A protein has these predicted regions:
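Solvent-exposed loop/turn and edge beta-strand elements of beta-rich ligand-binding domains
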Residues: 1-239
Length: 239
C-alpha cells in the first residue's frame, strides 16, 4: 500500500473563473474528489466524483479527469407583517447587520411581498427596523443565525399597531394650581363614550390606550381617528 485510504493527497482552491486543477503525480489506483468548503454564501456540495487512475496501457501517459460541482446559494426570506403575521406591510425601512455591526443590506418593505437575500454567509445577524409604516410601532431587533443549508431560511418581524393616550392637565385659570375631581368623557366621532377620566390631586388624568388610525384590508394606513374630550363635571367651586 503506497497511499493509505482516505488520505488527502492534494487540496486546491477555485479561481475567479470557478475552476481549479490538481497537478499531483499520483500512483496508479482509485481516487475520489470532493468539495470540503464552499465559497461564502453558498452550500457545500455533497457530491463525490470517483477517479479511475488505474493502468491503461503504455501509450497513455496522462490521465485527465474533469468534475463539475454546483453550489446552491444560501437564501434568507424576510417577512415584515402586522401582529397577526398574515399581512406583509409596506413602508417599513429595514436593515440587516452582521455580527461586526456592518450593514449587509437595507430596503423598504412592499405590500404583499417578502424580501429575499441570497448568498448570505453563515453567521449571526440582526434584523433592524429603522422606521415603521405610519400607524405602527417600531419593532424590537430580531437576531437570527444563518446556517449552511439549501433550504430557504425564514426570518419574521411583526409590527404592533400604534396606540396613544389622551392626557389632561387641569389647572385654575387664575392661580395655576391643579384642580382635582374634574370629570371628562372621551368620545368617538359618533358621540359614543369610550372612556371617563377624573383628575387627581395634581390635576392629571389620562385615558386608556386608544387606536390612532384605521387600516385597509392589506394592513396599510387608511385614515386618522379623531376623538372629542368633553368636561362633564366641574370641581366644587368651579363652573
Amino acid at each position: 500500500v503506497i497511499v493509505k485510504a482516505d488520505t488527502q493527497i492534494e487540496r486546491t482552491v477555485t479561481g475567479k473563473d470557478g475552476k481549479a486543477a490538481f497537478t499531483s503525480d499520483l500512483p496508479l489506483g482509485q481516487y475520489y474528489v470532493k468539495e470540503i468548503e464552499a465559497p461564502k454564501g453558498y452550500v457545500k456540495s455533497d457530491k463525490i466524483f470517483d477517479v479511475d487512475a488505474s493502468y491503461q496501457g503504455d501509450k497513455v501517459k496522462v490521465i485527465e479527469f474533469k468534475a463539475a460541482f454546483e453550489n446552491a446559494p444560501i437564501k434568507v426570506e424576510i417577512s415584515k407583517t402586522d401582529i397577526t403575521g398574515e399581512k406583509e406591510l409596506p413602508g417599513a425601512k429595514l436593515s440587516v447587520i452582521d455580527a461586526d455591526g456592518k450593514l449587509v443590506e437595507s430596503w423598504t418593505s412592499e405590500a404583499g411581498k417578502t424580501h429575499m437575500i441570497e448568498r448570505l454567509p453563515v453567521g449571526k445577524y440582526t434584523l433592524r427596523e429603522e422606521s415603521a409604516p405610519y400607524g405602527y410601532k417600531v419593532a424590537s431587533d430580531v437576531t437570527f443565525e444563518v446556517k449552511e443549508t439549501a433550504e430557504i431560511q425564514k426570518v419574521s418581524m411583526k409590527d404592533e399597531q400604534a396606540v396613544g393616550k389622551i392626557v389632561i392637565e387641569k389647572t385654575d385659570k387664575v392661580t395655576g394650581k391643579p384642580i382635582e375631581g374634574v370629570v371628562f368623557e372621551v368620545r368617538d366621532k359618533d358621540g359614543k363614550v369610550l372612556d371617563i377620566l377624573t383628575t387627581d390631586k395634581n390635576g392629571h388624568a389620562e385615558s386608556k390606550e386608544l387606536p390612532i388610525c384605521t387600516y385597509n384590508e392589506d394592513g396599510t394606513f387608511k385614515e386618522d381617528i379623531h376623538y372629542t374630550v368633553v368636561e362633564t363635571k366641574a370641581a366644587d367651586g368651579y363652573i
